Amino acid sequence: MIRIEHIKKKFKKVIALEDISASFEKGQVISLIGPNGSGKTTLIKSILGMVKPGSGKIFFNNEPINGDPSYRARIGYMPQIGRYPDNMKVGQLFTMLKNIRNVPANQTDEELIERFRLKEIFGKPMRTLSGGTRQKVSAALAFLFDPEVLILDEPTAGLDPLSSEILKEKILQEKSRNKLILITSHILSDLDELTTHIMYLHEGRLEFFKQIEELREETGELKLGKAIARIMKGEKFSSGWIDKMFILEGPSGEVKQENKVY
């Protein structure tokens, strides 16, 4: 469905993506993981046409995306930080996008609007919303037009536990409908029950792209965080690399620390 061929991208002297090739198909949930600055967001924005690669090609349903933005209507995108007009009310935002897309009401997916109880804040300006509430708005917008492909950048960041579970349930529901879903997250426990494939980037390079079951079999670990830590042993990373890279959870699920690599 989406095919990437030898994508390269530099920002001045910084290599963001170095010769990335991969294919993503319907029914897959691809988890893009790696340290900060590894190229995850650049890859996502390249697929969306928001960043133009220096070289290489990207195909959507076997058609090159260059010069034809129409394919984007078939993708639901949830950015890590949603940016919306400050003075626009929440309800106006949804109405505006429905009018732009001209999609009949019976063809929209408003489940997250209902489950997040967003109609209760339709009269509030976007500037008054907390970070977590803005995340709920972004999530509801990503799913609103029942897209074939979902691209979710740190989707549970800033969400309370209940809202996080609601969103994960929705992702699983769309997975069961054979949609292609790409997710980035530093909270690996969020990905255990969702993902089918792991795509690991480091310094703009693709280190591995594996089915999660293959990864578990190779490492003997059921938990994604532990599996990745094992498979990376013997590489150039330090022994504390996995701790530095990801949010760790204690035995009862509480967040212990968050150290990021830049």
What do these predicted ranges mean?
Residues L150-E154:
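Catalytic Walker B motif of ABC-type/P-loop ATPase nucleotide-binding domains
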Residues T95, N106-I121:
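Conserved ABC ATPase "signature" region
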Residues G56-Y71:
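Conserved ABC transporter NBD signature motif
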Residues P125-G132:
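Conserved ABC ATPase signature
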Residues I33-P35:
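The feature captures the beta-strand-to-loop junction immediately N-terminal to the Walker
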